Amino acid sequence: MSKRLHKGNMSLFDFQERYDSEDKCREFFLRLRYPHGFVCPHCGVSECGQVKTRNLLRCKSCRKQISITSGTVFHSSHLSLRQMNWAMFLFANDKRGCSAVQLQKMLKVNYDTAYFILQRLRKAMKIRDERYMLKGIVELDDTYVGTATHGKKRGRGTEKSKVIVAVAKTLNNKSTYIKMQVSPNLKAVTFGKFAKKNIAEGSRVESDNCPALKKGLAEKYFLHYETFSPEKDMLRRLHTAISNMKSMIEGTYHGVTKEHLQEYLDEFCFRYSRRSFGVQLFGRLAAAVFC
């Protein structure tokens, strides 16, 4: 089997045929974890044996055991390797997202297990995207997302959560990568912290004529502001992305709580930034989990 991540289209039939056993899934995960060969984290020796019944590697020098999933978001999970692989494939290959109820039915696990799997996958998406910063031309703005609230005197209701959004784009206005962050407020210092974490210094930031944005980003970015008008073609990529994000949250997940909103934003950003990969997204997600 090729040592590369999957490059061509992989159908459900292809996936079933390629990963029809624990051994094949184990081989796939090991290639992801050790693309240049195993190296013991304890003694540095490159030879090991396998304890397949427990998905462990045993160093032939120091005899220490290393779990295939150690250091990953699935560490200490009781899932089989096939379940992990199926979960990644099903989650990655539905561009609308996948709810815990859907995954529960497809994997034939209980709801709590399905929910745990999706939380782990979203965490892997977040960790992978934290490696990268937006640069070049970046559209920046904020939005409000309705989130469910519980425990109020009148029962369940909704409140608006503040979200800062930034979308990088090319010179011909094609959007590339995106960042979204739930924010406690929309003050200048908050925009400044968001930019420091997510936007490379020296980038050209395009936004509306918001005083907090001007003050928060004035020192380290080339700024371009316009007073917002619905007739103008300004921040179109960003507003389209916001609309798509809200459609995913309402359509697939039927709303989320404020406590978990960031997890769903992380999922959306990972998908959006890799939307051109199509079914190759499975390989990208697997790499995010195991690399």
Task: Identify the meaning behind each predicted range.
Residues 1-291:
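Residue-level recognition of single "structural anchor" positions
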